[in-house]
Amino acid sequence: MMNRSAFFVALLFAFFITGGQALAAQDSLFVPVGMSGNESATGIWWPEPVAKKAAKVSKSRIAKRDENLRAVREGASVVVWFHGGMSSGNCEKGFVAGADLAELYPEKIVVSISACRENHWVTRDMIDAVDAALDSVAAGRKAPVERVSLVGISDGTLGVLAYSVEGRRKVDDRLLMSSFGKFLGEPAVLASQKKMQSGRFRFLQGGKDRLYPSDQTVPWITDFCKVVSVDCELRFDPEGEHDWSYWKGKRMDWIREAIRK
């Protein structure tokens, strides 16, 4: 197994040979996975203040820049990305999985945790790992993280739903792409949970999803939205495919609308 030092070297090498397109996380860390003794590879992307060109960099300008940086980070909202393939053997997805989201929402703090093997999204330990990562954000910016928005793709959407019920933070917006909520049981039971009664839900579902057929997913989502007492909407694309690349390439407007500024 590759040790951590070797992994970070490989990660940086891959980043440079691709011209920086991977947008590797500014902070890469390992957070505890509940009481299991395991750790989850986590990436954090921080927003940056708009830089003004200066002929000379003085101490006062550096101090002002640092002050602006602190203010931007303290006031930024936080989005958690739940990647797909939650039971795969790749246990370091979190270091890069949130990169696209960070590009879409440069004004936000993006947090991406790694699920893998038995430490999948629908476990108490992984919910605790998400909160541990958010605790790290709070410590890093010296301001609490009280509310978050959640984005998931494929079985990452199970993490969105599970955190909504079990997580410590209040949830504002939820974006669930190519989901199969039936894995968690009856929609009415899940939708009636007390902690589901806040924020918004946006479901993006495709008619050409190769893994989750729309004749099974759409009725579940429809029933869920009928029961939950908050703003809940299904957006269906008959040509929609399963993968993130489709939604990013074809339905960017839906994605941007789902997570409010």
PLM regions with names:
Residues W121-R141:
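Alpha/beta-hydrolase active-site loop
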Residues G84, R202-L204, R210-K261:
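C-terminal catalytic histidine-bearing segment of alpha/beta-hydrolase fold enzymes
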Residues K195-F201:
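Short, proline-enriched alpha-helix->beta-strand connector loops that line the catalytic pocket
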Residues G140, E146-K195:
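Primarily recognizes the serine-hydrolase "nucleophile elbow" in alpha/beta-hydrolase
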Residues W81-S87, A138-R141, I153, V160, ...:
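Cell-envelope and extracellular/periplasmic
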Residues V9-G19:
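Bacterial N-terminal signal peptides
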